[in-house]
Amino acid sequence: LPVTNNMNKGDTKVMKCIVEVISDTLSKPNPLPISEECLETLRGDERIISILRHQNLLKELQEIAVQGANERTQQQRRTEDQELESLAAIEAELESVAHSLQAL
């Protein structure tokens, strides 16, 4: 794996661990567990930690968006149900008035 000279030793370790994880994941039906050395390297790298935090934040925002959409759908259904009940009450009142007028 060629590495440029302007990368420090820590960057090189992180890159090698990322390559190890990706290649194990993509090349085997049952991926091998990540080596302890790579696990520690990746856990200690602030860039990886930042990416994971960002990923968790995006997941949380997506969950909030889905929850909001579900709440709006439920509110819309409640509003539609209330409108249908109001229309049914008006219709019943109109029928009552029509019967009263027919009796005259």
From Swiss-Prot:
Bridged cysteine pairs (disulfide): C17-C38
Signal peptide as annotated in the record: none
GO CC, any one term: chromaffin granule
Chief place where the protein resides: cytoplasm
Entry's localization field: Cytoplasmic vesicle, Secretory vesicle; Secreted
Pfam families xref list: Granin
InterPro entries (alphabetical): Chromogranin_AB, Chromogranin_CS, Granin
Keywords: Cytoplasmic vesicle, Disulfide bond, Secreted
Gene Ontology biological process: adenylate cyclase-activating adrenergic receptor signaling pathway involved in cardiac muscle relaxation; defense response to bacterium; negative regulation of catecholamine secretion; negative regulation of insulin secretion
Main function: Chromogranin A probably has a paracrine role in the regulation of secretion or maturation.
Family label: Belongs to the chromogranin/secretogranin protein family.
Quaternary assembly: Dimer.
Descriptive protein name: Chromogranin-A
Species of the source: Struthio camelus
Designated gene of the protein: CHGA
